[in-house]
Amino acid sequence: MIERVLTDEHKRKLIVRVNRSNIQIHTERKDLLDYQFDLNVELFKFLKEQAVKVWKTFTPKAADSFGADYWEFYDRNTDNNGYLEIRNGLKFQSPNDETTLLYQFNKRRMESFIYDIESLIHREAIK
């Protein structure tokens, strides 16, 4: 497993854990249900680089189904949903206050997430 800690300009931290089949986003504390992190190019590049390594046929593309939309994911361990949206940064809702997990990407959700981030970079909304 690969793990990297990223810090935004407000000193908030995200822990990215990469394993054989998914990419997880964590915080340092379990009690944070809502969490915001400033999106930056370093995070984007790391996520895309790792996605290409985990999923050999990784191709960013628009969400074309509910399963491809990264807005919501189901966490089997807590039997609850977590949420992610891009609005003035990344806004996470953890599935449970008993876990540090904020979000877990599968291949298709990561493809649509990276596609949306690339669109923002193209419009120069992210620096």
Q: What spans do the regions from the language model cover?
A:
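Positively charged, low-complexity terminal tracts
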Residues: 1-127
